[in-house]
Amino acid sequence: MAIPIAQWVADARANLAHAEQVCNDANMYLTSTSEKLRRREMKVPKLIYYLDALKQQLRLLEIIRDSLVLNLNGVMEKRAALQSQLLKDVDRLHQTIDTLKNTVVVFDGQTTLYEYISESGVEELFNGVSQNLKDIQTLIKGNRTDALLIRLTSDLDHLSNELNALDSKFRDMRLVDTQSSSIDPISKLLEINAELEHDMVAILTSFNNHYDQCEKGEAILKDPAVPQDEKDELVSVLQNDVEELPEAQRSLTSNAEIIKKNCKEVMKILDIFEDYFQRVETYVCELQEYGESKLRVQLKEFSDINTEVSRKLEIAQTHQDELVQYNSDFQQFVRSYYSLILELDRRMRVNEHISSAIDNFRSTISNIVEKDHEKRMEFLQKHGDFIPQNLVDSSVINSGTPQISINFDQEPLPAISKEVVQLAKKMQK
């Protein structure tokens, strides 16, 4: 029986070439997967940095938002408190003005205290208060501070939800060293591929050895110096190898297909990572664009509103101070008016006291003068004829009673009724 050694050599060469091609194809998948995995491992630290930095940026934005809310609430609370106080002070000043209008000046009985104040200044203040409060209300409504705050909060909520989704996906991908690698699908697939690759190397080595043995066998069979029994043993070995070739080829192909399938699965997972990484980078750009454009505009709007409202509130505070001052001055005017009445009444009573005292003094003096006159007459009657004229100056002997003149010019004061005086006393309490 002829030994088909030449056919075995040809088949061995063909099988080796096919096995090499199968291994090369599988190796291409392994190399491509390894390269893509290497790129992923290089991106993981950057990804972790991105996520940490993004979380910090969002926390900073939330702090800015909360600060704006506090600032805006503070301005709005100040505005509400100041507006309430202004309205109270306006009402008080109106009441004081009504008092001025209802207080008739007793000195002429026609004019009121209101006619002695600067009406234009008061009206200008009232108009200023009213207009400034309207301006503040228009400013707040026109710029829709609530809407601005809602938009800012909505934007931050949207960004926060996106980042939370990205962070959750990151945890699901199990990329951190501290996480268990035993349940990492890529690690499991790569472990399987390593075992299959080891088997394929062994199979490819067997194909290569078989080819070498076939070539050597062909030479041995042609060599007459080799004993026949050795040739028969060699043929038996080669025959067994030839019979095992199809199964080895099937195992090699099967392993290669499994490796390709596993690599495709790994690539799919890596593609998911690449897509995720791209989403994170897109989010970074989105957050950066938001900060440089939309947030900048929103912050400027808040700043403009805050600045303008604060300026208007300063004006309102000035108005409030002026209202208090006007009210204080006008109330003091009323008190001073009634104090004037009491002062005039006091002076009138002083005049009366002085007049009464002078009348009493005149009566006393009159009695003294009258008694003095009687004494003089009595003296002259008894002694006048016996005193020489040159004993003392005759004018002394014959002088008359001293004359005393008392004049009192009363202070001209307007007449004030007792009812008005009583009212003045009541108003001073």
Curated annotation (Swiss-Prot):
Organism, by scientific name, is: Pichia angusta
What this protein is called in its record is Autophagy-related protein 17
Keyword Coiled coil in the entry? The reply is: yes
Molecular function (GO) terms listed? molecular adaptor activity; protein kinase activator activity
Q: Which Pfam families match?
A: ATG17_like (PF04108)
**Physiological role:** Autophagy-specific protein that functions in response to autophagy-inducing signals as a scaffold to recruit other ATG proteins to organize pre-autophagosomal structure (PAS) formation. Modulates the timing and magnitude of the autophagy response, such as the size of the sequestering vesicles. Plays particularly a role in pexophagy and nucleophagy.
Family recorded in the similarity comment: Belongs to the ATG17 family.
Q: How does it sit in the membrane?
A: Peripheral membrane protein
The major lineage groups are:
Eukaryota, Fungi, Dikarya, Ascomycota, Saccharomycotina
CC terms in the record's Gene Ontology section: Atg1/ULK1 kinase complex; phagophore assembly site membrane
Principal location listed in the UniProt entry: cytoplasm
Q: Name one GO biological process term.
A: autophagy of mitochondrion
Query: Sorted alphabetically, which keywords does the UniProt record give?
Result: Autophagy, Coiled coil, Cytoplasm, Membrane
The gene name on file is: ATG17
Subcellular locations according to the entry: Cytoplasm; Preautophagosomal structure membrane
